Amino acid sequence: MDSSFTPIEQMLKFRASRHEDFPYQEILLTRLCMHMQSKLLENRNKMLKAQGINETLFMALITLESQENHSIQPSELSCALGSSRTNATRIADELEKRGWIERRESDNDRRCLHLQLTEKGHEFLREVLPPQHNCLHQLWSALSTTEKDQLEQITRKLLSRLDQMEQDGVVLEAMS
């Protein structure tokens, strides 16, 4: 069975055969990473949809669950999710509607609002996380522990390089 990446790889090989200065391996690796990320997101979104939630709501629940008291201010949630405060309010509204969080006044300052994960929210996470973890184990079982360590090291190295390029104002050219 051909990989879903085969058509892209064939196109790149064709381009490389016509242009001797074509940076085949660099473009191939970049496209492989992009293709894999797309497939990972597609798979994850299908799983989350089957569980009745989307990525944004799920990440908000995980963010709350990861806090010491399972509580966070809306502005902190906004920052953690990389979204606007308006969008964080919409997210909190949906989580509250589903009974997964409660809005509570701060013990120290009544003007300060906290989003608190409810028992129903904890219960939902206890339900949805095991199938997700199982799926991840299935995916990553294709690699040995050594290969996973190597991939992590290489990925971190490339991410550091991207961060440095961004700091230096270097923009990746459009993919050929």
Swiss-Prot record:
State the SMART domains in the record: HTH_MARR
Task: Please give one Gene Ontology molecular function term for this protein.
Answer: DNA binding
- Triggers of expression: Autoregulated.
Question: Which Gene3D superfamilies is this protein grouped with?
Answer: Winged helix-like DNA-binding domain superfamily/Winged helix DNA-binding domain
Domain of life, per lineage: Bacteria
Query: What keywords sit in the KW lines?
Result: DNA-binding, Repressor, Transcription, Transcription regulation
Give every HTH marR-type domain span: 26-160
* GO cellular component labels: cytosol
**Listed InterPro entries:** HTH_MarR-typ, Tscrpt_reg_MarR-type_CS, WH-like_DNA-bd_sf, WH_DNA-bd_sf
What does the entry give for GO biological process? DNA-templated transcription; negative regulation of DNA-templated transcription; regulation of DNA-templated transcription; response to antibiotic; response to stress
Q: What does this protein do?
A: Negative regulator of the multidrug operon emrAB.
Protein name from the UniProt record: Transcriptional repressor MprA
Q: Which organism is it from?
A: Escherichia coli (strain K12)
| Biological classification of the source | Bacteria, Pseudomonadati, Pseudomonadota, Gammaproteobacteria, Enterobacterales
